[in-house]
Amino acid sequence: MNRTWLVIDSHNLCHRAWHSLPKLSWKGRPTEVIFGFLNSVDVLRRHFVTDDIVFCFEDSRSSFRKKLFADYKSKRHTPNPDPVEVQSREMLYQQIVGLRERHLPKAGFKNVLQYRGMESDDIMAVISRSLAYTKDDVILVTSDSDLYQCLAPNVMIYSLHDKKLKTEKWFKETHGIPPSRWAFVKAVGGCHTDCVPGIPGVGETTALKYARKELPKTTKAYQSIVAGKQIILRNRALVELPGGNCPIPELVPHRWPDQGWRKMLQSLGARTRMRA
């Protein structure tokens, strides 16, 4: 039986709920991230008509990338946060841990994944690599463009930014290179969101021109790229997916846990039940 695997960047989805929803609580415990996350999952599984959902959570606190490059993701947190921000982030963390360790497994979901030192996109990438060119379809749910490098005939990306499905064909037509070259482009142009500096004076647009062999050799940018091999090598280790030694999970096919889903929502004080 051919399956459609919905592989969710769960850390990303939790952060989106945290930024977009008002504060909610039940019996003194914060719940806005949990409810925003679960509502999105419910919408996604109905949209793609599949019960085979994989939740990928990251363990960035011990990321191997920080050991390779100390400034990796260094600007994502305020150096001296005020007490309100500290409390808000702690509430976010509590809800992420609650989803990963308690709510989702207890509801009956079998594929709830986290590996030491690995980010969500590492796990998503290793899953997509293991299932690429099989008869199953893989839909990566994320807003992280780094995962474009994983696109294949049966591996697609559903963007949380514009709610559109990105395919291998779309990528080739839009960028003029195969997905396998995307990590090189990111290594040359840098990744602002992850604080990975590229070749000085070279951005993504110029890096794409170089990758397509459209950048004249006489330009300063071309010469900078050629001279910046060490920067590119360092960055490849940071942006290439999957990174490190991410384990290949054994995914478990299963049906949507109707009863567990209802019980989970009731235990969280849901006034209106999301459909099971």
Outline where the language-model segments fall.
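Long, highly charged low-complexity segments enriched in Glu/Asp and Lys/Arg with interspersed Ser/Thr
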Residues: 261-276
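Accessory alpha-helical DNA-binding modules that contact the DNA backbone or grooves
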Residues: 178-250, 270-274
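Residues within well-ordered alpha-helical secondary structure of globular protein domains
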Residues: 130, 153, 212-213, 267
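Noncatalytic, basic helical substrate-engagement surface that gates or grips nucleic-acid strands
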Residues: 2-137, 147-165, 233-234, 240-256
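Conserved SAM-binding loop
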Residues: 140
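Short, charged, surface-exposed secondary-structure boundary motifs
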Residues: 165-175
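Short, motif-level signal for alpha-helix interfacial/capping segments enriched in acidic residues
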Residues: 121-130, 176-186
